[in-house]
């Protein structure tokens, strides 16, 4: 058996044959011969941390070896063994070959590929060596950690055992210190107590074993407890007690310190070991192997490309182009990747070596710490063992004897009393027994004499003197005469004296318990008293101790007390039984209704209850009531019915509970979905808030930096100002010493002048720094403006990128659903891409596995077919042979019947011959003389008889053999038929499995092909069957999407098409090939199988995997790029979110926006409209706080928007005043109370308009109109400016809209001339969804189709219309951010120019709308080139 030997400090692993080792020394010598560790320095442990004990019969599988030289701290001047530290390896990867002689020559390219292949092979070999070295380092680390774990386990076992002993000693020492302190301090009190308590002199002499001569020399006095103590020894112990107590306490204190230090060091070591295990580098084990596989895969790719180039013979243009592309691919990707991974492999080896060296150093430190802790544990253990064995504790033993002397005396007295009482009882019982036996003896003697006189004298011997009745003699041997005679009164007097002297309460309690134990009965007496149990008498217990119980007054008293107690219990139980019977009778008669009163009213039932209660008091009424129990059967039947109904209700409750559980499960599922959605929203909001906090912190840091610079500048200026003042004050303080320090003053003056010059220079320098800082701030402002412009542009790109990202994510999700419809779609895009890659790899593995199974199945089918052919031939041969055997058997049977007939005939002849022979013999016996003829005949008959007997035996034997052969052939035929049926069943099952595998393989192949087509690839095959996967041109992709020209979402095409799992195999034209195993002939089966395998094998899985891998990687790269851009756009958009809140809106009005309200031309109705671009008919509801009569404009924040439609037909009918309006926030219609609210601004019928409630946000408008100015004139000017802006934008359209429709006053007139019915049914008055195709044209028409649009700003060329529904007015924050990021509204000032601002807004609006479409198309084209249509 091989034993693994692990070396702790080097990490080596040795193997030793345990059969050749017989002892531990032999093991150490074997290990020392293979390592550099001497035998005397070897330490061996088991994996459990125990010391090794060699057992040749059951050797250990692993042994851990340690070097004791490394586990000890090196002494100064002593030589320590060298540490096991390996040098750090360095790997330098050579530059891959990249030179070629002739780029137009195929051999030159082949030579280049060959050199690159050789370089790659060398790198792979180097990486393999580094991988082996890395794994060896990790194996050494594993060995070190395991050895360290065993050492720590050894220490833990030792410390745990020591800790238990220390805890026990600590508990004992605490109580011992208190006891020893009490003994040392109460020594004099104990002696005075012993001196004052009198005792019996005889007991004192008995306890001290002194003879009478020792007491005769002393004066006659009353003996006390002091006489029982050796006074000299006691006084000496009293003197030594304080010093012994102090030494004991010091020893316990030192032990506590040492043990605490030991346990703390052990805990620290355990914590460090756990930390070392947690941060171990073993978790990185295996990385080098994965990296080596990647390098080998890249090298194999280079090798494959080299083999492909060897096939090229001619230097054609296409061949050179293909070779150059492959070489460029190697140069750009493969070779740098191999070089990079080789360097990474070297770094991994270096990291593993560093970790190994670090762990070796740590393990040595651990070993040294463990050695120190172990030595400390030995010292603590020796202290613990020595604590309870010191000679000083004998002092306290003497003191404890003095303290316990009253109890000892009381115990001796009680023992003397017990012995005397027992002896008296034994004497009394023996006398009683002797008397009783004497009576029995006399009665037996009288009976014998009477019998002998009457009967015995007739027979038998005469009575003699020896024929006496056996007698019983009782002798008591031994005597307790040595013990003094003591009585209970002596013990009671001693106890009372002890209490009067106020002895220790504990001592008094112990003596009192001792006195009480004297009255307790023995175990045999207790069994005698408890002989009556469970209604029977235990005669065994009654007879064993009957003598000792008889005549004992104490036992009689205890028996009487037990009898009284049992009688009281019996009375209590009887009274309780009566009460329970009474309650049961009441419940039976009063609570349960009988048959007669089931339908009584409550009053009658109350009367019945009263009657029943009164009847309980009357015995006769109780008898009458008891007779009414005959109706209980009816009640029992009723009870059964109620129980049946109760069971029915319980079943119904169970059904309801199941329904409730199902609803609860459904509710929990819905709640879980809601929680998941809320968590997703919460995560998004947290991300946005985190970005906001980052920008805020950055802005604060910049502001703090500016503040610090300003404070520094101010501080420097203050120093310059106070510099002169401080010098003047200093000069004034030294005026009294001017005549002594004139030279010093001059020197100080010169220094001050120099300092002033330096300060001036510093001021100039700080001024220059401040100027540079201002310039830097100005440059930052410029950069900030440029960044704001860039953010506007990027925000537009962000919208397009976000939409495309959502589309392509949906496409990836559809691909996931096609690949794994049963699994959940991952939420993160990288997880989704990795999942798709994994699913594709699983599909490839499944296909390869199916192909392998098909090949195995084919081999099995061929084997089975051969077996079937062999079995069929054997069956045919067996049938033929069986037929022959049956015919032979028939012939044999016929022959057997013939032979049997012959045998019967021969038996008859034989019987006849025997008769004749018998007759002949009779005649011969009678004396007749026969002739020679008779003798010959007799001989012939005998010969015939013998031959016929032999023939009969041979025929019987042959018949028996034939029957056995027939039976054997029948068994063989049955066995062959069974094998044939089993093989047929097995062949059918394998055929079904082959059919399933064929269908599965075909469906997988078809799904993979369609997956490539949907990913934007096209598959082409050459004549030799080689498959090529190419990108589908964009023109063909566009043809694939012409089914729905309005649907540009690539995921929609995937959704329109059937899923990968939905297409059945039966729809394929090659259905017959899937049934190749059901062919009629073997030749057709083989032919169909070959065709099927050719079609299946045409899909090259390597090419497919490479194409899908590259596509997924490209999509992943693009997704990361889009994520980075989206993150940047989102960060920049958040920084301007607050600014957009304070800008004036001119389109897409919603609650919370700032709007500029201007008066319209219709001054008679007091109509004020919101400044807008393409969003007319937003009128202001006038309030008293607005003071519109004294204003030219009003900037207010929108609080509410109400949508209304003018309907003049209601005013003609006079049925009900009111109209339908729609709230902009909730989309609900309400009715007005009067006609004035229906059309307050005299608008035309069928017109949709909006009433705005706003609160002034920016006061400061002039109170009165300026001189020679009016709102109508301002509006006219603005309308002209808008018309010029429109002409500037559209250029070719002029004043006409789409299709030549006039957009000026003529358009307004033509719009107003429409009929009421047509205007109500027009598209301008209907609610339309936002972002619908053609909404932009309707927005332009509706924008200029009203006579109340005072601000005739021509709308920009956009794709959005007025917010005509509640969904658009309740936009999400993201949509609001998109809308606000596309707007650039002017800031409100005290004086506003409507003309200039309308032109600027229109221009910026056009620019903001044109840029997203361009960016969208660019990003769309870039992503389509990666993922396909």
Swiss-Prot record:
Disulfide-bonded cysteines: none
Region entry Disordered, spans: 71-99, 1024-1061, 1209-1241, 1336-1429
Q: Where is the composition biased (Polar residues)?
A: 1345-1372, 1383-1393
Provide the alphabetized UniProt keywords: Autophagy, Coiled coil, Membrane, Protein transport, Transport, Vacuole
Subunit comment: Homodimer.
Q: Which residues form a coiled coil?
A: 143-173, 553-590, 632-815, 851-989, 1105-1143
The UniProt regions of compositional bias labelled Basic and acidic residues, in chain numbering, are 1209-1229
Q: Localized where?
A: Preautophagosomal structure membrane; Vacuole membrane
Q: Which GO terms describe its molecular function?
A: molecular adaptor activity; protein kinase binding
Q: Where is the composition biased (Acidic residues)?
A: 1230-1239
Name by which UniProt lists this protein: Autophagy-related protein 11
Q: Which InterPro entries match?
A: ATG11, Atg11_C, ATG17-like_dom
**What is stated as this protein's family in its record?**
Belongs to the ATG11 family.
Q: How does it sit in the membrane?
A: Peripheral membrane protein
Zinc-finger is among the record's keywords: no
